[in-house]
Structure formats: C-alpha cells, structure tokens
C-alpha cells in the first residue's frame, strides 16, 4: 500500500484539523479509492453480462481518526460537514439520496461482519468528477468501507465482497439502481475483466496494460449534461431488459437463450415494444464484443480492440439508445460524439461512456493527436471538459500512517 504524497497529506490534514481540531498524537488512517472507466460492456453488468473496466488516476483520498463517540463525522472538501449517529444502522428514509446514507449503509455492511461500530472522524478530497460517469459514489462507498474495516478490526474483505457491500448500499440506502461493475472496478484496481452471471461470486481477471504503450491515450470528455439528472432514463434500461427476461420466466438476460429470444421476437415486440427488444439485442451483441476486446487486449492487438470499440459505440447509439435522454434540440452526448469523430477523422475510437444520457464520452486518441483533440474539445465544450486519464493499478485500500 502506498502512502499519500506530501501535498495530498498536507491538504487532508489541514481539512481535518479545520473541521475537527488538532490530530495531536492520535493514530491516522489513510484511505484511497480510485475512480473508474468502463472500457467495454455498456449496460451489461446488471444483466449478468461481461465487462472490462479500469481504475483511474483520480481518486477519493482521505484520513480517518478514531474517536470515543458513537458518531461518524465526515468532512468532504467543498461541501458542508455532516455526521451520523451509530444508534441505528437501519435505512433512514430521510437520508435517501444523501451522502449520509452512504456512511450508514456501509456501516451496516461492515457491522454485519460481527464487529462493533465505533465513532471516527473522516476528512477526504475527491478528484473524481461527480455526475460524469467515473463512479465518484462507488469510490466514496469503497473508501468508507476500507476505513471502517480497518478502524473496527473487521476480517479482511476481498475486493469483490467490498464491491457487493457498496452496491447494496447504493441500491438500498442511497436508493439508486446500479450494477456491480462500478464498485468492482474501484475495489479491484487496474484493468479487469468481470463476468457477473454468478451474482454471489463474479469471476474476474486482471491484465497489466497501458494504452500509451500501444500508441493511444484514454480521454474522457464531459458533455456538459450531468447524467444524475437522467436517473429515470438510466433506470429504464435494466427495467426494459429485465421485462424481456421475465417473458421467459427469468430475472436477467444472461439466463435467456438467445435462440429462444429470436423465436419469440414478434410476440415480444407486440407486447413490450421496439425499444425493449432493441436493448436486449444490444445486450447479447455487446457481451460478445466484450469477450472479443478482452482477447484483443491480451494479444496486444490494439487495432482490433479499436475496431470492436467502434462497433460497440454504434450498438449503444442505435440499439441501447443511451446517448440521447429525450429527443429534442438539446443532444449534448451526440453532439460531443460527433465533434470527437470529426477530430479523430477515422483514427482511434469514440463511444458513449458508462450509464450514458449525459455524463461523459470515451475516446481512444492517437498520441500524436491527443493535444489537438483535447484543445479542440475544450474549445467547443468548455475548458476542462476533456482530460487524458491513465489506468491506475491500485484498488481501494486503507493504511496506517
């Protein structure tokens, strides 16, 4: 585990002491949880499908100090400090959709391991952009989990198990639907392939790979529309996919035989409509593209990876339909995709990123074009919209300083 650099530690210490008073000679716990980028597998995780994701060089960084209270106090740079009491760890309806719900939910999960919850103060900074599809909420959940695991003396928690705790917290306490990919990527670190068919024990593989070594930069571009505002559009994707699965007596599309789907298509279309059927078509097509892209990356075949990524982007736009939230004159994601394609001029690849309906697009940009690409996208969409990211090999962890 790596300690924070001097600048990060100084920032965290200043924030902590401004909010909670001097640390003195008390023991300090450092916590780190990265953001993530979905590399392959657009809306496949919630159907038990396959995903490739990478943790990024942006993160939640925090320090925690135990107290003799029954309160957890949290200082998040740039936001009001808040606290929860540990009198009850049950879901609080008044906290849904708030940061406090994530603390209480993770406390419930860690306490369920058989440890006694104890108070602590936690100050953190977050360089993961919120509402941009880089999973800032998953990083925060994982950071709370690693802090509680260590401070409360819980048994060591495997990355996938911590991810499942974080997912339950987001689903039940924060009250937002999500698959497991975001949390798993944050907890695993590096570039990882995930198979979610077995929800209890997802299969994972990791690969050491740096896109820059193959001549490309991973660039994410904020489109100027927060995907948080499109929660209903997002929620409709798994709902419609699972409506299709339900017609076969199944819960998720991974449990449905594609040949059975083909045979029943006219009936499904008449009952569920075109979009639900199109989204199911995307699931199977994209799932296959994930496996092909993982094989290409393992073989070091970046050209084939890019061809398949372009196919994936087309499927998301045409069949999954998570690029445009509501038809009308404002289409920020489609606009950003068009501009990116214009600059790339047939090179690299670009696709919608993550949940879609706003947030970010993802581009793999030739290194000789990356400065021009970022400058042009920033000129069109606003300074800071486009950023070059690197894959980080560290998943969520905590370490005593």
Provide a role label for each language-model segment.
Residues 357:
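Glycine-rich phosphate-binding loop
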Residues 138-139, 360-365:
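FabD-like malonyl-/acyl-CoA
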Residues 55, 99, 329:
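Short, conserved glycine- and acidic-residue-centered signature motifs
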Residues 131, 295, 360:
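Short, flexible active-site loop motifs that bind/organize anionic cofactors or intermediates
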Residues 1-51, 84-213, 370-373, 388, ...:
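Gly/Ser-rich oxyanion-binding loop with an adjacent helix/lid
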